[in-house]
Amino acid sequence: MRKPYLNPRIFQQRRQKLASLIPGAAVVLPAWPEAIRNHDGHFPYRQESSLLYLAGFDEPGACLVFRPGMKPETVMFVRPKNVERETWDGFRYGVDGAKQEFGFDEVYSIDEFEKVAPTLLKDCQKVYYSLYRNRETQ
């Protein structure tokens, strides 16, 4: 399994700094979509900056829900493992790998986002989200 490029504790410290600034709120950070170059090729992937800074997770199709002071505090949604797609698109951590390597409190498949996210956000006083940055996740 591929290791994260930095120690996950660095990202935990960054999230702790943010937590002190937004008590009772949540942050939702979706990954940037992949940019298609032509019908069967993509441009090199670049993660959304805030997600990369706070989670260190560099795969497309992901979303971080960060809820400071709540249980679970860090919930990551990722693309599931798929050996066939990995042959063409490259390595994927999947649900188990993301939890093991990055230390998120909970990890779900991105396919479960619409079902799980409302329950995660219902008790939050505010939700921070960048509007109009990613049409796929609006």
What annotation goes with each model-predicted range?
Residues 1-138:
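A composition/biophysics-driven feature that prefers long, compositionally simple stretches
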